[in-house]
């Protein structure tokens, strides 16, 4: 029975491990995988996968590797399943036979005992089969993992494609950045040019200030030089005298010639030295003269610039004044003043033209004088040339006289040439002089014979010397005259400086006047703008007249006359409107006052213009005086030139006479020539200065012409403004007509209201309620829309800030993408290398292509699934993009709605104002109607009360009469007729009562109707309140939506921040985990040392162990539990194979070795082994705890990786949102461009209209075109200034943007460096992990070797123990009877032990398989590590290169930015100063204008209120008149009715009187009858008595 139980347990343990159906399924899957692998290889080799050969080779190599691993696993699986099936079938047959004979006899037990070991081995084999099945399942899981790896590879490829797209985008962004850089460079060049221009201007100004002082100093130097020249002239005269004395000495004694020759040599040397000194001095003087001329030219340029600036300022002042005149003339209807102003301007223009013509004539005279001066210069040069020829002739004569001294002639000719080049031929002259002296000494004897000849020649020479001296005197006089002219010119320069200073003071005063005028003009402009705003109300009425005026403008040629006529017509129409509209009398009176003030302003402005014209005329006169002075100076210079020419002739005559002193005279001639050149240079400089002044005058004339053109254009502008004023007048006329029409309509409505008072009450009440509700709704809508607009603006601001932040994040992402691109490039290089390596392995794997078809199919299916996933992802992306587009469209629609809302707000505001006016009118009407109704009610109530009193009195009378009638009927029937008449009268009175009751019922109905109207009004108010509440609810919902959008934006920002913090936390946690792993590894090493110590203790204790079998059974049960826990741990270890499987395998091997030793030493184990096993259990528990910790760490790492991936996905989503926002921005930019185009078209239309007007007015304003052109040029200059200021502001903005970009780039660089550091740290951590894994592998190998050594030792011990067991078998037979009872227990224990051994073997096999897999993975990891190292090196190189380039770019940008910042700072300081001045003036003017505008607005409001009140009062008066009329009618009706009632009463009274008289007569008759009867009765009684 126990054996059956044991077999059943084995079957229950092993049956699930081998299933026939699962085996067939695995075969089918194997065939499918083989087909798929073959298909993939075929596609790869045919080139269907990709066009790149590298990708094909990689895919083929991966498939082959996968297929080889798969085949190896499948072979192991086939072997294990085959062995298990054989063993299971054998056991099934043996189980049936053994079950019948299990309990038959005791002998079978012995067989079982003998065959126990064989059965245990079979059981062990079964257990190994089960373990093999588990290994196969693990292999299947490995295959699944590999499939996941393929999917990850495909995902990586998809990521690579996305990275390529990102690279393309990065390239585009780089191109854009390069374009921006080029633009920035261009802007910087322009900035540098502008800065250089400004610096040059500053330098010129400084030079202008310095040159004034330099000129003064140079004037003093010139005076000193003049004194020196005078002294030299005296010295020259003295030398002439000495030369004459020497000539007389020559006549007397020829013996003294030798001494004289020596003296002459000395004098020649001294003269040569003097000549050299003079030449150097002359050169220095020439250089100084040149510098002076340059400085004078610079001063003249500066003066010209100052004059131009003065003219510009004057023109600007004139422009401003004319602008203010235009503004005043636009809104003034003073045509006569305009005509006078035009006449004055035309006369002034004519005068200016005359001045210009005279100045042009003067310029022509100047040009002629300059031409004459140039001709005279040419004559002087010719005379100088003739003088040089005469000198040469004199030299020739000297050579003829000095026939014996031919060498002297050569020396003279050489010296003549040396005058032009003194420095170059000085040495040659010295040599010639020495040779000449020797020759003179040799020829003194021959000269004695020729003394007589020479005496005659000397006499002639003396005469010539006298003539030359006279000429020298004349030249000196002329030199003095030139010096005097120079002094005069210097004085003129001083005067010019003084005049310049005066002009500067005038300029400052003009600037102050200009500022004051600007203030006044700004105030006046604001007043005119207010008037224009007030006149805009009449624009609608004047449109028709404007169209007519435009048609007339096209036809008519003379614009000014037409304008004046139209203005007169407009004034007449205005006067007619004023006469027609009595309500607007006050506004027109105010306008008349304004017109009078404008007249005064216009007269003052005319006075200012006349003063300005007089100032310009004075300036022209001063310029003419300057021109006349310059002409005088030119004439003086010409006379000086003539005098110099005569002096030169005289000097040449003296040179012919002074033959002995020719050397000194030649030196002096050289000096004179140099002086002549200096004078010529001075004259040329004077001529240049004159030319410059003439040019300045021409420029001033040109400026005057430009001013004329500007004035003409300004006149055109004035005409245009007059046209606009006419348009406004026409519009006012049209508005007045509309007001009249509206007034007539209102009068008609009032008449209709009088006729239909009751219906109007109903309609007015309903209308008023509706208007009140509408007003409330509109006001609430305005408030809500304003709030929504503010919220939208705040949202726009927040969105703009978000966009900026997202752009920063985009830049960071782009930098990261660039890094990834570099990594991809490096990985591609490594892949190409690997492909070359793998190409060698292709031939080996060709045999496996057939078997890999099924694998190819599986891979195809996976590829298809991956493609489907990719499609799904693409669809998701497309959907997200569509959602982004939809969001962008919604945003654009929201912006359009906001614009529409703004427009609707404006419309509603205008409508609300109109409705308020109408509401006020209707309120007034309502109040008047209510008053009328109340008075009417009061009157009706009084009438009803009177009628009721009358009814009561009539009823009383009817009762009395009925009683009297009854008495009368009883008394007499004759009164029936009268009674019928009275009944008719009563019926009439009853009819009247019924009518009165009907009237009272009608009045009651009217009251009921009014009460119903009031009820309806209350209902409408309630409805309007409900609508207001609904609108408030919608506004609240919109605000909630806005708040939700803001909250989303804030959430996104918080999510981004939290994700960044999470990433940082994950990095910190990774570091902590790495530290913990390192600590755990250290603890594992310590545990390994403890285990080695324990193994040594086990060996010692094995020798001494002799424990009982019972303890072994308990220990085996514990080992079984441990094995179960170890199987669980192994499953966990299989999941965690990557990190710590090697350590577990080492420990499990040690445990296997220990268990084998225990199995072999079952009989000899004792209590010590139990203690050791308890220690092992503790250690295994510790190992399991460590493994669980490792798994937890891995799970945490995986979760963090997932979180990181999710963060990356969110970042991608944000980037896509940013793209959508960019698209929205592009759409907004397009809309803006469209709006700009519309504005341009409108501007073009306006320009076309202005062109038409200009064409119409060009025929009349031909004279003023010059002035207008000048004004246009000044306007263009002002526009250029404004444009430059705008460009400066733009450049400032660009500068700020560039600084922001630089900060962004720096942030991106910092982030890149941080990312690089994190990558380096991760790489270091990976390297440390690899090192640790290598160390653990080394430890595992060492432990494995030690385990093999221990196994060998244990095997020896086992053999020794077997021998001892053989010895003790005999003793065992004797004890067999005692052990029969315990045999079954031992068998069960042995079976358990065998099961444990089987499990251990299976676990060992699993561990070996896992070790193989790990070795393969280690190789793959090593390859990947090498790849990563190479990629890291390339990345480091690329990063260094990028860092260097970025740093260089940053330095360049920083330098350029600093330069631009300096320039901008200087410019900004100047601009701020100027802006401060202008802002002060503008602020003061704005304050004045503000007060004026407020006053005018208040006045206008008061006028409007007064007009409205007057209108309301008129309407009320009219209504009251109508009511009075109605009341009079009603009173007449009542009077008529009362008269009728009075007549009826009179008739009734008359009838009653008649009736009473009748009754009285009847009573009297009856009384008489009674008295008669009584008398008759008394008589009868008396008679009877008698």
UniProtKB/Swiss-Prot annotation:
Does the keyword field hold Cell membrane? yes
- InterPro entries documented for this protein: NAB
Q: Which domain of life is it from?
A: Eukaryota
KO phenotype (gene knockout): Short hypocotyls. Increased sensitivity to osmotic stress (e.g. mannitol), but reduced sensitivity to abscisic acid (ABA) associated with lower levels of abiotic stress-related gene expression but higher ABA biosynthesis genes levels.
Ranges annotated as biased composition (Basic and acidic residues)? 249-262
Report keywords, A-Z: Abscisic acid signaling pathway, Cell membrane, Coiled coil, Cytoplasm, Cytoskeleton, Leucine-rich repeat, Membrane, Repeat
* Disordered: region residues: 88-119, 249-286, 325-353, 430-456, 965-985
Which residue intervals define the domain NAB in the entry? 10-84
Q: Which GO terms describe its biological process?
A: abscisic acid-activated signaling pathway; cellular response to abscisic acid stimulus; positive regulation of abscisic acid-activated signaling pathway; regulation of protein import into nucleus; response to abscisic acid; response to osmotic stress
Q: What is this protein called?
A: COP1-interactive protein 1
**Annotated source species:** Arabidopsis thaliana (Mouse-ear cress)
């Amino acid at each position: 029975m126990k054996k059956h139980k044991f077999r059943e347990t084995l079957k229950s343990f092993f049956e699930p491990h081998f299933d026939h159906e699962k085996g067939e399924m695995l075969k089918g899957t194997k065939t499918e995988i083989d087909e798929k692998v073959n298909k993939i290889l075929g596609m790869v080799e045919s080139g269907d996968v990709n066009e790149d050969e590298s990708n094909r080779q990689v895919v083929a190599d991966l498939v082959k590797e996968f297929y080889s691993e798969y085949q190896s696993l499948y072979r192991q699986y086939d072997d294990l399943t085959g062995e298990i099936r054989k063993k299971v079938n054998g056991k099934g047959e043996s189980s049936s036979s053994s079950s019948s004979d299990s309990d038959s006899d005791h002998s079978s037990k012995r067989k079982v005992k003998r065959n126990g070991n064989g059965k245990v081995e079979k059981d062990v084999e079964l257990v190994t089969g089960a373990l093999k099945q588990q290994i196969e399942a693990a292999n299947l899981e490995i295959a699944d993992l590999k499939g996941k790896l393929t999917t990850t590879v495909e995902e990586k490829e998809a990521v690579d494609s996305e990275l390529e797209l990102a690279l393309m985008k990065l390239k585009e962004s780089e191109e854009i950045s390069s374009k921006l850089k080029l633009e920035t460079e261009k802007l910087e060049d322009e900035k540098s040019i502008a800065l250089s221009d400004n610096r040059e201007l500053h330098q010129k100004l400084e030079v202008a200030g310095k040159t004034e002082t330099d000129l003064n100093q140079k004037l003093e130097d010139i005076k000193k030089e003049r004194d020196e020249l005078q002294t030299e002239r005296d010295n020259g005269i003295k030398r002439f005298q000495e030369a004459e004395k020497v000539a007389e000495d020559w006549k007397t004694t020829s013996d003294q010639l030798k001494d004289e020759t020596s003296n002459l040599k000395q004098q020649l040397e001294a003269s040569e030295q003097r000549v050299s000194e003079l030449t150097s001095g002359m050169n220095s003087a020439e250089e100084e003269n040149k510098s002076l001329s340059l400085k004078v030219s610079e001063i003249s340029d500066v003066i010209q610039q100052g004059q131009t600036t003065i003219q510009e300022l004057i023109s600007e002042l004139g422009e401003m004044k004319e602008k203010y005149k235009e503004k005043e003339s636009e809104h003034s209807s003073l045509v006569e003043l305009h005509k006078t102003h035009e006449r004055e301007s035309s006369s002034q223009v004519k005068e200016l033209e005359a001045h210009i013509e005279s100045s042009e004539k003067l310029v022509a005279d100047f040009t002629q004088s300059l031409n004459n001066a140039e001709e005279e210069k040419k004559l002087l040069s010719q005379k100088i040339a003739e003088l040089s020829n005469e000198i040469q002739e004199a030299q020739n004569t000297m050579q003829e006289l000095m026939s014996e001294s031919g060498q002297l002639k050569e020396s003279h000719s050489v010296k003549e040439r040396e005058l032009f080049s003194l420095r170059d031929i000085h040495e040659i002259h010295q040599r010639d002089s020495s040779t000449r002296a020797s020759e003179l000494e040799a020829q003194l004897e021959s000269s004695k014979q020729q003394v007589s000849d020479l005496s005659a020649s000397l006499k002639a020479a003396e005469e010539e010397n006298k003539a030359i001296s006279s000429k020298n005197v004349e030249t000196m006089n002329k030199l003095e005259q030139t010096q005097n002219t120079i002094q005069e010119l210097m004085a003129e320069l001083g005067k010019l400086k003084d005049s310049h200073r005066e002009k500067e003071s005038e300029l400052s005063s003009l600037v102050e006047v200009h500022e004051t005028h600007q203030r006044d003009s700004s105030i006046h402009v604001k007043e005119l703008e207010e008037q224009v705003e007030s006149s805009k109300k009449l624009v609608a009425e004047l449109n028709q007249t404007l169209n007519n005026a435009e048609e007339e403008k096209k036809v008519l040629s003379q614009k000014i006359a037409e304008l004046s006529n139209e203005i007169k017509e407009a004034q007449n129409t205005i006067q007619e409107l004023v006469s027609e509209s009595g309500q607007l009398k006050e506004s027109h009176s105010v306008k008349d006052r304004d017109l009078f003030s404008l007249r005064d302003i216009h007269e003052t402005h005319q006075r200012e213009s006349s003063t300005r014209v007089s100032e310009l005329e004075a300036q022209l006169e001063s310029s003419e005086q300057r021109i006349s002075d310059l002409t005088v100076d030119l004439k003086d210079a010409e006379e000086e030139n003539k005098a110099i020419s005569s002096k030169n002739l005289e000097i040449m005559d003296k040179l012919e006479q002074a033959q002995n002193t020719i050397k000194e005279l030649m030196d002096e001639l050289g000096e004179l020539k140099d002086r002549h050149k200096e004078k010529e240079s001075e004259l040329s400089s004077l001529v240049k200065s004159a030319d410059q002044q003439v040019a300045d005058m021409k420029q001033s004339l040109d400026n005057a012409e430009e001013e004329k053109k500007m004035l003409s254009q300004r006149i055109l502008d004035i005409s245009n403004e007059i046209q606009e004023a006419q348009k406004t007048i026409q519009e006012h006329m049209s508005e007045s007509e509309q007001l009249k029409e509206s007034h007539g309509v209102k009068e008609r409505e009032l008449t209709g209201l009088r006729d239909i008072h009751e219906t109007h009450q109903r309609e007015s009440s309903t209308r008023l309620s509706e208007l009140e509700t509408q007003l409330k709704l509109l006001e609430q809508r305005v408030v809500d829309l304003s709030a929504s607009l503010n919220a939208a603006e705040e949202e726009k601001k927040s969105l703009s800030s978000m966009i900026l932040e997202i752009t920063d994040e985009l830049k960071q992402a782009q930098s990261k993408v660039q890094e990834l691109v570099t990594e991809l490039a490096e990985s591609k290089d490594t892949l190409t290398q690997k492909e070359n390596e793998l190409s060698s392995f292709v031939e080996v794997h060709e045999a496996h292509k057939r078997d890999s078809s099924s694998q190819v199919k599986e891979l195809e299916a996976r590829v298809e699934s991956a493609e489907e996933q990719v499609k799904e992802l693409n669809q998701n992306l497309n959907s997200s993009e569509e959602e982004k587009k939809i969001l962008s469209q919604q945003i654009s629609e929201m912006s359009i709605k906001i614009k529409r809302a703004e427009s609707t707000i404006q419309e509603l505001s205008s409508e609300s104002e109109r409705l308020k006016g109408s509401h006020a009118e209707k309120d007034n009407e309502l109040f008047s109607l209510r008053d009328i109704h109340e008075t009417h009610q009061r009157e009706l109530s009084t009438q009803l009360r009177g009628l009721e009193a009358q009814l009561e009195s009539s009823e009383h009378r009817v009762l009395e009469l009925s009683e009297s009638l009854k008495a009368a009927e009883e008394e007499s029937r004759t009164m029936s007729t009268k009674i019928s008449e009275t009944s008719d009268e009563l019926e009439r009175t009853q009819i009247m009562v019924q009518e009165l009751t009907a009237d009272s019922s009608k009045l009651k109905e009217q009251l009921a109707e009014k009460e119903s109207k009031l009820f309806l009004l209350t209902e409408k108010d309630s409805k309007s309140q409900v609508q207001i509440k609904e609108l408030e609810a919608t506004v609240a919902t919109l605000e909630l939506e806005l708040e939700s959008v803001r909250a989303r934006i804030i959430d996104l920002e918080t999510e981004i921040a939290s994700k960044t913090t999470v990433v940082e936390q994950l990095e910190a946690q990774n570091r902590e985990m790495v530290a913990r792993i390192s600590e755990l590894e250290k603890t594992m090493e310590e545990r390994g040392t403890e285990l080695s110590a324990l193994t040594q203790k086990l060996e010692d204790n094995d020798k001494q162990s002799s424990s009982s079998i019972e303890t072994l059974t308990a220990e085996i049960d514990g080992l079984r539990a441990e094995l179960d826990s170890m199987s669980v741990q192994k499953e966990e270890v299989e999941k965690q194979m990557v990190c710590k499987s090697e350590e577990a395998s080492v420990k499990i091997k040690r445990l296997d070795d220990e268990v084998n030793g225990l199995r072999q030493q079952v009989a000899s184990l004792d209590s010590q082994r139990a203690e050791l096993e308890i220690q092992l259990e503790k250690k295994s528990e510790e190992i399991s705890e460590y493994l669980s910790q490792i798994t937890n760490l891995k799970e945490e790492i995986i979760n963090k990786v997932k979180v990181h991936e999710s963060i990356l996905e969110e970042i991608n989503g944000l980037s896509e949102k940013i793209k959508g926002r960019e698209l929205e921005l592009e759409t907004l930019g397009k809309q803006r461009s469209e709006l700009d185009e519309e504005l341009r078209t409108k501007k073009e239309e306006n320009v076309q209209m202005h062109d038409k007007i200009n064409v119409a007015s060009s025929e009349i304003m031909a004279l003023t075109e010059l002035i207008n052109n000048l004004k246009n040029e000044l306007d263009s200059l002002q526009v250029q200034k404004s444009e430059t200021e705008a460009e400066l502001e733009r450049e400032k903005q660009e500068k700020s943007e560039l600084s922001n970009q630089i900060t962004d780039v720096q942030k991106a660089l910092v982030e890149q460096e941080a990312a690089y550091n994190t990558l380096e740290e991760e790489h270091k951590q990976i390297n440390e992990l690899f090192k640790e894994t290598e160390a653990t592998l080394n430890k595992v190998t060492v432990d494995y070797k030690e385990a093999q050594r221990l196994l060998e030792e244990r095997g020896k011990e086992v053999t020794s123990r077997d021998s001892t067991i053989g010895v003790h078998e005999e003793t065992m037979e004797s004890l067999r009877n005692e052990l029969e009872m315990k045999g079954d227990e031992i068998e069960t224990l042995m079976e358990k032990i065998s099961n444990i051994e089987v499990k251990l073997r299976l676990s060992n096999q699993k561990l070996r398989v896992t070790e193989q897999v790990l070795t393969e993975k280690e190789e793959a990891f090593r390859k990947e590590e090498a790849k990563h190292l190479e990629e890291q090196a390339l990345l480091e190189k690329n990063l260094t290169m990028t860092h260097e380039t970025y740093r260089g770019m940053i330095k360049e940008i920083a330098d350029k930015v600093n330069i631009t910042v300096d320039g901008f700072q200087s410019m900004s300081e100047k601009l701020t100063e100027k802006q401060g001045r202008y802002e002060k003036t503008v602020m003061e003017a704005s304050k004045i204008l503000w007060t004026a505008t407020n006053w005018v607005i208040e006045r206008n409001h008061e006028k409007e209120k007064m007009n409205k009140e007057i209108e309301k009062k008129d309407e009320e008066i009219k209504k009251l008149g109508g009511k009075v009329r109605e009341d009079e009618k009603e009173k007449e009706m009542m009077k008529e009715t009362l008269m009728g009632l009075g007549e009826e009463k009179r008739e009734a009274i008359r009838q009653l009187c008649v009736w009473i008289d009748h009754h009285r007569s009847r009573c009297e008759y009856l009384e008489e009858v009674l008295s008669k009867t009584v008398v008759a009765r008394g008589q009868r009684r008396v008679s009877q008595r008698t």
